[in-house]
Swiss-Prot record:
SUBUNIT field: Monomer.
Residue ranges constituting the tr-type G domain according to the UniProt record: 10-204
Gene designation per UniProt: tuf
Name of the protein this chain belongs to: Elongation factor Tu
Similarity annotation: Belongs to the TRAFAC class translation factor GTPase superfamily. Classic translation factor GTPase family. EF-Tu/EF-1A subfamily.
Chain segments annotated as coiled-coil in the UniProt record: none
Catalytic activity: GTP + H2O = GDP + phosphate + H(+)
Region G1: start-end pairs: 19-26
CC per GO annotation: cytosol
Location, primary (coarse class): cytoplasm
């Protein structure tokens, strides 16, 4: 059978199910595909298919993730679901599955549980911008007042982590009953998808963001000048554009791009995803190096101190065998280069064990172009021992 061509007629949005173990995340994922399949907008995926998530490697970390896709009238969705709690932590921190919004699944019979809280915190820390709530297992709760109580608890919890708890859509349903084809509960899945359609905005596409390219290599062409090469991470670049070289120096350096080429051919415009060489006017070979970024002027600034949410690899994942303490000095790998940094643990945290997920403050010995949400690896002697996401810039 010929492969269907991927038609991009609708805006694309990345979402995922989050929440406590056994509250019904995977059942809900299956129910969404089943209900939308009846409208011809998805392929129904059985619970077992989703639950048997394949292992993937992201930054040297093994993560099990299931990917399903489906459509609504307005959009095309890519949806991630993880079998285990640790997979969520790793997924969100490494950015393996960048979510534009999440469906928080809470069992109405149990109310918010520890991982409910942890997933909300993680969403806040790694920059998941919007959350829609699905109160699951409502068929098991006869008491309307109890449902309202659980809803209030969830809203309060969201507000506690700076999500707009009062405005977040909360849909009461039963994923299992919907999956079994009960029309009353299928309706709730449609209601949920309408809420996701309306409440989670279409994300800005990478190509529409301000230009940035991490520099991978630099060389000089006699008589023409200095060329920086790399893969455009976001935005577009045209000949004649002003750019800044940011990072590894206290002040960004301004220059103009006098040529853009790709596969040795000259290009009018490079865009997100292209591997290019950019010819830089008036820049000598020693003024630009791997680890810096080329960026639209003023769009990103160099920093040395920040807070980050970090997942520390277990020894089975090839990480450390022993804990580390404040003042630990590993290498922080941002995009294309390592920079040494000093870690300060939060008050009351004595040490960090392999397998932990922790917030920490980092001070780099050289400034790097970073912003909230920038991902990095922590390395020690060339091996990855942690993965992190910048949650707050300090200086």
């Amino acid at each position: 059978m010929a492969k269907e061509k991927f038609e991009r007629k609708k805006p694309h949005v990345n979402i995922g199910t989050i929440g406590h173990v056994d509250h019904g995340k995977t059942t809900l994922t299956a129910a969404i595909t089943a209900v939308l399949a009846k409208q011809g907008k998805a392929q129904a995926r059985a619970y077992d298919q989703i639950d048997a998530a394949p292992e993937e490697r992201e930054r040297g970390i093994t993560i099990s993730t299931s990917h399903v896709e489906y459509e609504t009238d307005n959009r095309h969705y890519a949806h991630v679901d993880c079998p285990g709690h640790a997979d969520y932590v790793k997924n969100m921190i490494t950015g393996a599955a960048q979510m534009d919004g999440a469906i928080l699944v809470v069992s109405a019979a149990d109310g918010p549980m520890p991982q409910t809280r942890e997933h909300i915190l993680l969403s806040r820390q790694v920059g998941v911008p919007y959350i829609v709530v699905f109160l699951n297992k409502c068929d098991m709760v006869d008491d309307e007042e109890l449902l309202e109580l659980v809803e209030m608890e969830v809203r309060d919890l969201l507000s506690e982590y700076d999500f707009p708890g009062d405005e977040v859509p909360v849909i009461k349903g039963s994923a299992l009953k919907a999956l079994e084809g009960d029309p009353q509960w299928e309706e709730k899945i449609i209601e949920l998808m309408n809420a996701v359609d309306e409440y989670i905005p279409t994300p800005q596409r990478e190509i529409d963001k301000p230009f940035m390219m991490p520099i991978e290599d630099v060389f000089s062409i006699t008589g023409r000048g200095t060329v920086a090469t790399g893969r455009v991470e976001r935005g577009t670049l045209k000949v004649g554009d002003a750019v800044e070289i940011v990072g590894l120096a206290d002040e960004p350096k301004s220059t103009t791009v006098t040529g853009v080429e790709m596969f040795r051919k000259l290009l009018d415009q490079a865009e997100a995803g292209d591997n290019i060489g950019a010819l830089l006017r008036g820049v000598s070979r020693d003024e630009v190096e791997r680890g810096q970024v080329l960026a639209k002027p003023g769009s990103i600034t160099p920093h040395t101190k920040f807070k980050a949410q970090v997942y520390v690899l277990t020894k089975e994942e090839g990480g450390r065998h022993t804990p580390f303490f404040s003042n630990y000095r590993p290498q922080f790998y941002f995009r294309t280069t390592d920079v040494t940094g000093i870690i300060t643990l939060p008050e009351g945290v004595e040490m960090v064990m392999p397998g932990d997920n922790v917030e920490m403050t980092v001070e780099l010995i050289a400034p790097i172009a970073i912003e909230e949400g920038t991902k990095f690896s922590i390395r020690e002697g060339g091996r990855t021992v942690g993965a992190g996401s910048v949650s707050e810039i300090i200086e």
